[in-house]
Amino acid sequence: MKLHTLKSTPGARVEKHRVGRGHAAGKGKQAGKGQSGQNKRHGHRLGFEGGQTPWFRRIGKRGFTNVNHVEYQVVNLKDLEQNFKANATVDLESLFKANLIKRSMPVKLLGNGKLTKKLNVTLHAASKSAIDAVEQAGGKFTIL
């Protein structure tokens, strides 16, 4: 193999086509644009959807996202039941080791599922039903 014998892979180098220059050129009349009409013409502005009511007009003008709202990671009672032994301490570190949460956000315990083991739970927040279930199983819930 020598440099002067190297060839490009098929399809890597495509010859330039001058479009809209007559039938004989191979790309005359519609110039590869299909039918005449709106889509044959020049481009369109940002947000234009072809006459359909655009997204920014379909959504409402009301409401906003509160910059101070807290977004919680959710852990359910069934997750605690599956991943922890009786009399265990459930905190952020143990939940992270059990692969139930990421470190970045606060955690809220919700009451989905049943809890039969006595656990000591220390988290940022919990629903009323989750706290009741932990205490009914003989455990204790503490807010961080």
UniProtKB/Swiss-Prot annotation:
Keywords on record: Ribonucleoprotein, Ribosomal protein, RNA-binding, rRNA-binding
Gene Ontology molecular function, alphabetical: rRNA binding; structural constituent of ribosome
A Gene Ontology BP annotation from the UniProt entry: translation
InterPro entries: Ribosomal_uL15, Ribosomal_uL15/eL18, Ribosomal_uL15/eL18_sf, Ribosomal_uL15_bac-type, Ribosomal_uL15_CS
A GO cellular component annotation in the UniProt record: cytosolic large ribosomal subunit
Function: Binds to the 23S rRNA.
Family: Belongs to the universal ribosomal protein uL15 family.
Subunit structure and binding partners: Part of the 50S ribosomal subunit.
Protein name, per record: Large ribosomal subunit protein uL15
Lineage: Bacteria, Bacillati, Mycoplasmatota, Mycoplasmoidales, Metamycoplasmataceae
Protein's gene: rplO
